[in-house]
From Swiss-Prot:
Family membership noted in the UniProt record: Belongs to the PMP-22/EMP/MP20 family. CACNG subfamily.
Tissue specificity note: Brain. Enriched in Bergman glia, as well as a variety of neuronal populations including locus coeruleus, olfactory bulb, lateral septal nucleus, interpeduncular nucleus, and the CA2 and rostral/medial CA1 regions of hippocampus.
Subcellular location(s) of the protein: Membrane; Postsynaptic density membrane
InterPro entries: CACNG_subunit, PMP22/EMP/MP20/Claudin, VDCC_g5su, VDCC_gsu
Protein known as: Voltage-dependent calcium channel gamma-5 subunit
Functional description taken from the UniProt entry: Regulates the gating properties of AMPA-selective glutamate receptors (AMPARs). Modulates their gating properties by accelerating their rates of activation, deactivation and desensitization. Displays subunit-specific AMPA receptor regulation. Shows specificity for GRIA1, GRIA4 and the long isoform of GRIA2. Thought to stabilize the calcium channel in an inactivated (closed) state.
Keywords from the named record: Cell membrane, Membrane, Postsynaptic cell membrane, Synapse, Transmembrane, Transmembrane helix
Record text on subunit structure and interactions: The L-type calcium channel is composed of five subunits: alpha-1, alpha-2/delta, beta and gamma. Acts as an auxiliary subunit for AMPA-selective glutamate receptors (AMPARs). Found in a complex with GRIA1, GRIA2, GRIA3, GRIA4, CNIH2, CNIH3, CACNG2, CACNG3, CACNG4, CACNG7 and CACNG8. Interacts with GRIA1, GRIA2, GRIA3 and GRIA4.
Amino acid sequence: MSACGRKALTLLSSVFAVCGLGLLGIAVSTDYWLYLEEGIILPQNQSTEVKMSLHSGLWRVCFLAGEERGRCFTIEYVMPMNSQMTSESTVNVLKMIRSATPFPLVSLFFMFIGFILSNIGHIRPHRTILAFVSGIFFILSGLSLVVGLVLYISSINDEMLNRTKDAETYFNYKYGWSFAFAAISFLLTESAGVMSVYLFMKRYTAEDMYRPHPGFYRPRLSNCSDYSGQFLHPDAWIRGRSPSDISSDASLQMNSNYPALLKCPDYDQMSSSPC
């Protein structure tokens, strides 16, 4: 993988992480996950009359039509005690939504940690482990978010299946843009996590490629040994003796066993033969 491609992938993973974190933060803090509308069907001309309409988030519900129009309440306290809801289905849906609320929060926390570690890893490229850890946090964030989305959808579908059908009333719902932001954030977060892990694998492989093998050099005998330098060079390692070396050693041994030099009394020169 070229350096240019690695930089482009690093930049792309950072952009995906920023976008995913921003979209999830907006989705968690806004109240447009779900739109609910409840009314009656007029028998004269089969037209509909809206009795109650609202939009809901993870924390609040705001009424768009009905007696409480323009007012917002928390999910725990859907409306004042002296008010009446048109149907119990709306109350049950809003209560079941609370079971999915912790998962987007955990996802947001994991995504923030992964974003911080990813930026530190980009600032210090030699710390390749940070890219791997940030990728794991991004993947965990995406998994937590998708679990929350599945629970959110299943809670609404279960209530719709258990709802008593009535020919004179209708109950409609649709998902809002906050829910869409959370779904897009899941895709971006998982993509950022996969790219971060891929970058870690490439950097780790490149480090191993240029790292010398530990068995290439032999250890030195000592700092003061005359033979310690030869262990730094593979060419100077001990090899088998050649036949020429063996013959040279044999000739030296024969010369050493020759009779000692004798001195003749009549001459000043040295001779090897007896006088």
